[in-house]
A protein has these predicted regions:
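Short, amphipathic alpha-helical segments
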Residues: 75-91, 284-297
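A conserved beta-strand/loop capping segment in the N-terminal third of enzymes
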Residues: 85-109, 298, 302
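Flavin (primarily FAD) cofactor-binding/catalytic cores of flavoenzymes
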Residues: 6-56, 60-62, 105-262, 270-473, ...
């Protein structure tokens, strides 16, 4: 439905005939799709939103493109509404699905269901599709199935070029490119664990090495188990930590004083540990304490000095990740069973030299405790360290061009793009752009919690308001442009 609408509409709407605001969103995963919806609901009949996505999966992005129904969300369905003012929106959509589409999904009244990422991607596509066909948004949202490769200043706005050679003149642009997959496959080594062939064509009895022990590793193990892999699976990381299991817990009240967030990591850690001890003494679960931090995480992060953030990334991030980003119970049970029978092992080690050999690769493991290096063999090594955040290593031509021109710069922690508190990108000279923005995982270094739906949905709402504050409607000026399919 989405692709058909796009191709039917793009031939007949020359931009020079439009006098409203023209806003481009680059990337159509959750962040870009939801930002588009909020912009459409806040703009008038002459305004246009162009949603640009290089893949065919509008609304899915990297995270929700998984075709494996056993790759589950790590947030309960009751917390996964795309709209903060409609907390049951996702649950209502689930309950309205035909039984044959719900598959094994069980939506209970306690809202604790964990559904597949594949199904959640369908939910986002449903939202996008309904917006396209609504009377209020008709002929105002255009899906461009192409890769944005360049963005150049043009008058008061930008000229956006796509790989197919077309250019679009827009008043503002938002970068919503989500997570960048790692690149650099080699013989016996898979850099991108989300690629379709990551676990394909393996001897079912062959040893596999996974580098990383977080949620990406968990998904990869589930994929291997689903394809009846019987061979040993070794997962390594410097600390050997495994994500904790979700559990049903009663909510814990917010406990940090408003406006008095600690400015040192030591003080913050002391406060949280004390609250966990207090909660435990009352018979409550540590998970509830960690979850109660969600409304405050953005302010906590922004309040920490740069040196404290760097200290967090060096020393505490792995511990935070495994306690904050937990496994769905059914997934945790499968991982635990694989550990109990010895098929899955988790060790503290670092990856050393890889030497291709017949039938696989010889791997040098570097123990973290000073023990001598160890040589093992595996048919395949799969990188499970998560998305690529170092922009200097990202191959996307748009990002490379924006960095080279100085239009954007990496944040000081090298986790993404530096932006203002409102989401305007910061250029190489340190100035906030008037009409270039970023949203979602690209802004992780500034806001930290920008990878989960409950956080991104609020960010998209705020950014939509800010964009429209910065980009005033045009009165009568026609803007020349090239537009169409040929």
């Amino acid at each position: 439905m989405l692709r058909g609408y796009f191709y039917a509409q793009m031939r007949e709407v020359p931009l020079a005939q439009v006098r409203g605001r023209q806003i481009a969103i680059i990337g159509a995963g959750f962040s870009g799709s939801l930002l588009a919806v909020h912009l459409l609901r806040r703009t008038g009949p002459e305004d246009r939103v162009y949603l640009i996505e290089r893949s065919a999966g509008f609304g899915r992005g990297l995270v929700y493109a998984s075709g494996n129904p056993h790759h589950l969300l790590n947030v309960r369905a009751g917390n996964m509404s795309a709209f903060s003012d409609q907390p049951d929106h996702f649950l209502e959509w689930l309950r309205a699905l035909p039984e044959n589409e719900r598959s094994a999904v069980s939506v209970s009244e306690d809202r604790l269901t964990f559904v597949s990422r594949q199904l959640y991607g369908s939910y986002i596509q449903h939202i996008l599709g309904r917006e396209i066909w609504s009377a209020e948004s008709a002929h105002r949202l255009y899906l461009i199935a192409d890769e944005a490769v360049a963005l150049h200043p043009a008058g008061a706005g930008y000229s956006l070029e796509v790989a197919g050679g077309l250019r679009y003149e827009v008043d503002a642009a938002a970068l919503a490119m989500g997570n960048f997959p790692p690149e650099g496959d080699a013989r016996g080594y898979i850099a991108n664990p989300w690629s379709q062939g990551a676990t394909a064509d393996l001897d079912s009895d062959a040893p596999v090495l996974l580098v990383g022990t977080g949620l990406t590793m968990v998904d990869t193990v589930i994929s291997l188990l689903d394809q009846k892999h019987r061979g040993p699976i070794l997962a390594i990381s410097r600390r050997g930590l495994l994500p904790r299991r979700h559990a049903a817990v009663a909510p814990h009240p917010r406990f940090l004083p408003a406006g008095e967030a600690p400015r040192s990591l030591r003080a913050l850690l002391k406060t949280v540990r004390a609250e966990i001890r207090h909660a435990t003494a009352l018979g409550r679960d540590w998970r509830a304490v960690i979850d109660s931090l969600r409304p405050d995480t953005r302010d906590l992060w922004r309040n920490l000095p740069l040196e404290e953030k760097q200290r967090f990334l060096r020393h505490l991030r792995p511990w935070w990740d495994v306690h904050r980003h937990r496994m769905a119970p059914s997934v945790a049970s499968r991982i635990e069973r694989a550990l109990e029978r010895g098929q899955l092992q988790i060790r503290r080690a670092r990856l050393g030299r890889l030497t291709p050999k017949r039938g696989g690769v010889e791997v040098e493991l570097l123990p973290v405790a000073g023990a001598p290096a160890e040589q093992i063999e595996a048919e395949r090594v799969i990188n499970c360290m998560g998305p690529l955040s170092d922009l200097s290593r990202v191959a996307a031509p748009l990002i490379r061009g924006l960095l080279a021109s100085g239009a954007v710069r990496s944040d000081p922690l090298n986790l993404g793009i530096e932006v203002s508190g409102e989401g305007a990108v910061i250029d190489a000279a340190g100035y906030a752009a008037r009409n270039l923005f970023a949203v979602g995982p690209l802004t992780k270094g500034v806001f930290w919690e920008t990878t989960a739906v409950p956080d991104i949905r609020v960010q998209c709402e705020r950014l939509a308001d800010h964009i429209l504050e910065r980009v005033a409607p045009k009165i009568s000026e026609d803007v020349p442009a090239k537009m169409g399919l040929g």
